[in-house]
């Protein structure tokens, strides 16, 4: 569907308007096909005529899309969260490792990392206590040596 529109200004402006359908919606576009003048017209008048044609547009109505929600369980039964059954292993959810694993008795290689960390912390604690005892012995030995020197 196309229409021709003419405008009576000092010159004639012919626009070509067409309606297009896209996805169930209609859009109307207009293009200036030719501009002809019989005499000289100022640029201001030409811009006004183009501006007049540009502001005369039609609003297009768009159909809104609707979505239907289908239940995953047609019987209406919903499943609750999986609970821990009390057996050994990690909690049901661990960050970065995915879900589920609470009742399975743990996962071998992941347990080794925790054991290694605990062993390192235990070793550092032992070294800290050992250093405190060593410093205390040196202070006592130095204190006794100083007392012996003063008494002689």
From Swiss-Prot:
GO BP terms: chloroplast organization; thylakoid membrane organization
Compositionally biased residues, Polar residues: 52-69
Keyword Transit peptide attributed: yes
Cystine pairs: none
UniProt-annotated location(s): Mitochondrion
Targeting presequence: 1-52
Tagged with keyword Mitochondrion: yes
Main location: mitochondrion
Disordered, as annotated region: 52-101
Gene Ontology annotations for the cellular component aspect, listed alphabetically: chloroplast; mitochondrion
Keyword set, alphabetical order: Mitochondrion, Transit peptide
Known role: Non-functional allele of the RF2 fertility restorer of rice varieties with LD-type cytoplasmic male sterility (CMS). Functional allele is found in the japonica cultivars Fukuyama and Owarihatamochi (AC F1SZ42), and indica cultivar Kasalath (AC F1SZ41).
Protein name listed in UniProt: Protein FERTILITY RESTORER RF2, mitochondrial
Native source organism of the sequence: Oryza sativa subsp. japonica (Rice)
